[in-house]
C-alpha cells in the first residue's frame, strides 16, 4: 500500500494486540513489531513522500492568540491551551480534571492518551492557569475544555482555527510553530523536543535520563506564553 500513515496506525494497533497476547502466553512474539518488519519492508518515506502539516509562521502566533482571547467559546479556550502547552490536539481536547495538579502546576497525561504510549508531565504556566480558572465554574464533566459532558471534537477546534487563519493551517501545525520559535529563541534542541514530548534518542538523551527537566521546561513554556501574549520584556 502507498497509504503509509494508515498502515502505520494499523501496525501499532496490531502490535498492542499481539503484545497483550504474549502477556497472556497465547503467543511467543509480536509479528507486527517494526524492529522485525523493518528488515523486509521499506521505510515509509521510500514509498510515498511525507506530507508535513501546514504550520503558521511563529511570528503570526501572537496575533492569532489575541483573537482567540476575544472569543469565549470552549473551542477557543481549547486552542489557547493547545498553543500554550504545545500539546497534541487530542491530548488537550480530552484533558480531564484528574490529570491536573495545580499545587505542583503539573499536567500528567496517562500513557494510554499519548502517542508514544508513555506517561508524560507538562508544566502548567500562569497563562494556562487562567484557562483552568475559566473552566472551573462551568464544569459539567471530568473533561476540562468543554461545556458539555463530552470532549470537544477535532472538527470543532479545527473550525475555530480556520476562522482566523488560512484553510491550510492545521491545529497540529501549531506545534511546528512552537518548535520554530524554540529554534529562533536559542532553546537547546533536546529541551525543545522534550517540550513537545518527543522521544529523544542517542547519547544526548542519556544525559537527561534521570529527569524530565520539568523545571527547565516550565521556564521555556512561560517565555513562550509571554511571547504569545506580547508580554516579553
Regions found by a protein language model. Give the residues of each.
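Basic, Lys/Arg- and aromatic-enriched nucleic-acid-binding interface segment
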Residues: 2-15, 23-95, 103, 115, ...
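Conserved tyrosine-mediated DNA breakage-rejoining catalytic core shared by Y-recombinases
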Residues: 34-43, 85, 94-134, 200-206
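Catalytic-site neighborhood detector that most strongly recognizes the C-terminal catalytic loop/helix
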Residues: 47, 109-117, 129, 150-151, ...
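Hydrophobic alpha-helix feature that most strongly marks membrane-spanning transmembrane helices
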Residues: 66-69, 73, 97, 133-137, ...
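A generic secondary-structure signal for well-formed alpha-helical elements
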Residues: 18-26, 89, 99, 186, ...
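Active-site/catalytic core of tyrosine-dependent DNA strand-transfer enzymes
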Residues: 3, 10, 17, 55-62, ...
Amino acid at each position: 500500500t502507498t497509504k503509509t500513515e494508515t498502515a502505520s496506525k494499523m501496525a501499532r494497533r496490531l502490535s498492542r494486540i499481539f503484545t497483550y497476547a504474549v502477556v497472556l502466553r497465547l503467543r511467543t512474539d509480536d509479528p507486527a513489531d517494526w524492529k522485525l518488519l523493518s528488515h523486509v519492508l521499506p521505510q515509509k518515506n521510500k514509498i510515498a513522500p511525507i506530507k508535513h502539516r501546514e504550520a503558521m509562521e511563529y511570528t503570526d502566533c501572537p496575533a492569532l492568540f489575541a483573537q482567540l482571547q476575544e472569543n469565549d467559546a470552549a473551542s477557543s479556550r481549547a486552542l489557547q491551551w493547545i498553543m500554550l502547552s504545545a500539546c497534541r490536539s487530542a491530548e488537550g481536547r480530552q484533558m480531564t480534571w484528574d490529570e491536573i495538579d495545580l499545587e505542583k502546576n503539573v499536567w500528567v497525561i496517562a500513557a494510554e492518551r499519548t502517542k508514544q504510549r508513555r506517561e508524560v508531565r507538562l508544566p502548567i504556566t500562569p497563562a494556562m492557569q487562567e484557562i483552568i480558572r475559566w473552566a472551573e465554574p462551568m464544569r459539567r464533566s471530568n473533561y476540562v475544555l468543554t461545556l458539555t459532558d463530552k470532549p470537544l471534537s477535532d472538527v470543532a477546534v479545527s473550525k475555530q482555527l480556520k476562522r482566523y487563519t488560512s484553510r491550510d493551517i492545521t491545529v497540529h501545525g501549531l506545534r511546528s510553530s512552537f518548535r520554530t520559535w524554540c529554534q529562533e529563541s536559542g532553546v537547546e534542541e533536546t529541551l525543545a523536543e522534550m517540550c513537545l514530548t518527543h522521544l529523544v534518542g542517542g547519547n544526548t538523551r542519556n544525559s537527561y535520563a534521570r529527569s524530565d527537566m520539568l523545571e527547565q521546561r516550565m521556564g521555556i513554556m512561560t517565555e513562550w506564553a509571554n511571547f504569545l501574549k506580547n508580554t516579553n520584556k
